[in-house]
Amino acid sequence: MIQTQTMLEVADNSGARQVMCIKVLGGSHRRYATVGDIIKVTVKEAIPRGKVKKGQVLKAVVVRTRKGVRRPDGSLIRFDGNAAVLLNNQDAPIGTRIFGPVTRELRNEKFMKIISLAPEVL
């Protein structure tokens, strides 16, 4: 469950290390985002010579949450931290590699690129 002011790790090689959620997209008073939701983020920490700079405002898709994802069979997939993958204005990933596992809930036509780049799909 990601809300405004939540800090997230970045799970790609775009150059950002940490981002902060500034808005949950999809509805005028939407409070929380979960795995597969698009959020607006600002870069809080970045590496030198990366594709993104500190202070930049971008879109991101949430790929891992501490809260977890409940599956229809009753199982819960939970992670150690919150992570996101940065997106450009066309909702395509900025980075060319994805680090760490992602969940099967991302498997729709919008995020198949992230699924194919991920080392592990849970």
Swiss-Prot record:
List the PROSITE patterns. Answer: RIBOSOMAL_L14
CDD domains to which the protein is assigned, alphabetical? Ribosomal_uL14
Could you list the residue ranges that cross the membrane?
Answer: none
UniProt keywords (A-Z) are: Ribonucleoprotein, Ribosomal protein, RNA-binding, rRNA-binding
Its GO biological process annotations read: translation
Keyword RNA-binding tagged:
yes
Q: Classify the source by domain of life.
A: Bacteria
Which Gene Ontology terms of cellular component type are present? Answer: cytosolic large ribosomal subunit
A molecular function (GO) term: large ribosomal subunit rRNA binding
Record's family?
Belongs to the universal ribosomal protein uL14 family.
What is the annotated role of this protein in its UniProt record?
Answer: Binds to 23S rRNA. Forms part of two intersubunit bridges in the 70S ribosome.
What does the subunit section of this Swiss-Prot or TrEMBL entry state? Part of the 50S ribosomal subunit. Forms a cluster with proteins L3 and L19. In the 70S ribosome, L14 and L19 interact and together make contacts with the 16S rRNA in bridges B5 and B8.
Q: What is this protein called?
A: Large ribosomal subunit protein uL14
Q: Which gene encodes it?
A: rplN
